Amino acid sequence: MGARASQPYEIKERIDGKTVIVTGCNTGIGKPTAQEFYRVGGRVIMACRDVSKAEKAADEIRKEVELSFPHDKAGKLIIKKLDLSSLESIRNFVDDLNDSEDQINILVNNAGVMSPTRKTTADGFELTFGTNYLGHFYLTLLLLPRILASAPARIVNVSSLAYEYGRIHWDNLSLERNYGMFTAYSQSKLANILFTRELASRLDGMGVTVNSLCPGVSATDITRFYGGVIRKIWGYLCPLVQKTIPEAITTILFCALDKSLDADSGFYYSDCARKELAPHALSEEDAKKLWDLSLTLVGLEEFPVKDNKADGLRIVAA
């Protein structure tokens, strides 16, 4: 699982005037991530499934920042409903965002779930794959025209070391047979990395970078999905490997903001350092196959980019 070696990331420059989207940020590592963007002047879109919980989180963020930082120096928190397990909700979110936001400078695809039993999304996909990967795939592609128009911009996909144990079950993608919580989770996190590499390749030279990362092990609400025995084992192991929340969000902030990554795209990071991927995550064939399959699953039709212009990429509902 790796050591808890990283130090909290120090943001060196303010981001006044920049718009940042963070998915799943009413809890877990998403919340302090949103807080840091807000603290240094960002216009932060809190994209959350539960609006009431997001409002409570936003109030807590504002109070926390006010305690240690002049409030007039902070940015703005904007709450928008986004349920990544529903394609309709994603479309509604994007429509709303396109009406209210002129630019998207940073997209942090952070939201994630685990489920001890097999469940499905509103559209019939296995819940973990549908939320952690496919929902973010659909969201990112629908937002691409606005992101490209805002270049330079960054897309940050939160993955996990669990990808090393994952594989794409091409003939059983929704795990209707032999479902397992970690099988589903590791598949979704591998998919995040394959998507990152394929999208980075397609956006090469267009001013938008795409990177993935492992934040490390931390005490987040995702552990609520663990069963009793696993939770007990986790209780023993946790102190040995768990990162503090400031440590856990370090690599997210690094990938989103650090100037040293201005030209880096398609890579995987942990503890603020580029890491070599396992061989099965480097398969260009699998990345392309997953891309094409994902387009079909969410009902999108892609047209080629022309002359490296943002308006040359058209993605429309089929």
Map each language-model feature to its residues.
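Universal eukaryotic N-terminal targeting presequences
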Residues: 1-2, 317
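C-terminal helical subdomain
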Residues: 90, 188, 212, 236-277, ...
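A broadly tuned preference for mixed-charge, low-complexity surface segments
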Residues: 99-100, 161, 262-272, 304-318
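Amphipathic terminal alpha-helices
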Residues: 280, 287-318
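Residues within alpha-helical segments
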Residues: 35, 55-58, 197, 249, ...
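Juxtamembrane interface at the ends
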Residues: 231-235
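Rossmann-fold NAD(P)H-dependent dehydrogenase/reductase core
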Residues: 3-230, 298-309
